[in-house]
């Protein structure tokens, strides 16, 4: 029983200390054309969807979308909720001119946010 409690306690401490963030772009950046997005992660690992490993997950990029209201459900997959289930850590977005709000959210092997959700600050970019 003690081992189980220690394992749960360690997992909780790891997700609490974990951070997902944007390496690029920076908040307020302006672009002409495609936007390269590079994901950063500390205190946690990246693993493809479908692979259940402790202290890992994969990236989801929210575009002009709020965090899910129910974090116990899988993250939607659509234009505003991009899945990187192969374990990718960067992408290139082709966006129409406009202002975009971007946020990263980690999901587990089933695309469900972790019990202690790991998400980035929101950044805003403009495509001209």
How would you label these PLM feature ranges?
Residues 35-39, 89, 98-106:
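Short, well-structured beta-strand segments within conserved domains
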Residues 48-53, 110-119:
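Beta-sandwich strand segments
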Residues 40-50:
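Short amphipathic, basic-aromatic surface patches that mediate peripheral association
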Residues 17-32:
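Short, compositionally biased P/S/T/A/G/V-rich stretches that sit at domain boundaries
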Residues 72-91:
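A beta-strand/beta-hairpin structural motif
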Residues 3-13:
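Sec-dependent N-terminal signal peptides
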Residues 58-62:
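Beta-strand signatures of extracellular beta-sandwich domains
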Residues 96-111, 119-123:
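Internal, hydrophobic beta-strand segments that form the core of beta-sheet-rich folds
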